[in-house]
Swiss-Prot record:
It holds the Pfam family MFS_1. Disruption phenotype: Leads to complete abolishment of hexadehydro-astechrome production. Its main location: membrane. Induction: The expression of the hexadehydro-astechrome cluster is induced by glucose. Expression is controlled by ambiant iron conditions in a hapX- and steA-dependent manner. PANTHER family: MFS-TYPE TRANSPORTER DBAD-RELATED, MONOCARBOXYLATE TRANSPORTER. The chain crosses the membrane at residues 44-64, 80-100, 112-132, 135-155, 168-188, 195-215, 255-275, 296-316, 322-342, 346-366, 387-407, 415-435. This is MFS-type transporter hasB. The keyword Membrane applies. One of its GO terms (molecular function) is transmembrane transporter activity. It is a multi-pass membrane protein.
Amino acid sequence: MSEEAPKHEAPSVISPIENEEKGLAPKPLERVPPNGGAKAWACVAGSFLLQFCSFGYVNACGIFQLYYQETMLKDQTSSALAWITTLQIFLLFMFGPAVGKMIDVYGCRRTLPPFSIGAVFSVCMLSLCTKYWQVMLAQGVAFGLAAAGLSLPAMATATQWFSTKKGLAVGIVSAGSSLGGVIYPCMLPRLIEQVGFASAVRWTALMQGILLFIANLLCSSPYPPLGRASKEASAEKDATEPTPRRSGLRGFKSLPWGFFVLGCFFTMWGLFAPLNYLPEMAALHGYQSFARYTLAIANAGSLVGRIVPGWVSDIIGQFNTMCIVTSLSGVLVLAFWLPLEFHTSLAGIIVFALLFGFVSGGFVSLGPPCVVSLAEDRVDEIGVKLGGFCLAIALGALTGLPIEGAIKDREGNKFTGLMCFAGATMILGGVCTGTARVFKGGPRLMKKV
């Protein structure tokens, strides 16, 4: 009587179909980031270039404002010229989250090329512009939309590769916009002097085309795009297994969230005033040849400000750090920039540009972590709240600079009213952010929030 040898069975793998037959809920596809590797850091480098060519170009707004004011569009008011910059920033933040969702669904390989082509095309069209409405369409609308498809999605693409190194990756990527704010203000005025505005802008378009081509080659995602199939599968699952959902709008009713969004809105009312008007102020006070470098100095400070406040926030908390940088931004304008209107010095302009660049860089880098903290890591609320945050930023940017330009137009070549408005609104933004911090973490000052 022969005995059968014991069989060593391999562990069974239950397919989603078998799960469904047995009444088990199908497990979602696990997406574990590689957290490093050659492709991951190549994607970080590519995203750095995307930021350099998009938000970095927008950071050179003061140079364009100065050139338009003095040469090409002398018949336009400061308020009218400010709409060019504000429209870029508004479109960048308004449509950035939507493009980020497109990258999730279709992948960066399909999404980034059209926006890269659009960015280069809009800069080429700017070189042909001679009238205000043409500049508004080419630089304000066309480049603003293209930048929306490159800047915020650059962050999303790079962070997909990391789990524990996301902070470092975001810091490197966001530094691309600050470096752009250093390079463009130094490069463009020199080119304009040598070859004229049209040729200078075309050379810029050529440089951006080369860099964006490299960026598109380097950027990739560790996961396959979700596509429409996952949407249909999710809808089918919801139909067969209905589960109660919490509305994403529920989070908007919380007091911490309301005050935080209000604080971001007021801060954006004043944040771009020094970046847009500091070169013009330096030129009017006798530093014409140095005016072009004020933006480069401010963005050099911002380069450090993107990283250091993030490191500090790991120690004392994101909200505590956010309250400090927003309030300091307003205090610097009122206590440092405003006196320079009456007692102008080259050293004072340099120090103010560095300090303000540092604290304003902290506001830009700390916003998204505060949003995640307010959502309490609930995935169903992070996207909605990030969209609300971007909407507040966009509306603040859209209305802030034109208001400040209108104030300046009433005062002629003086910046006193503009400075008071910008400083007061940023301090008000700091107060609102501080109120949100108290509602979220309590009144104890030393608590990490």
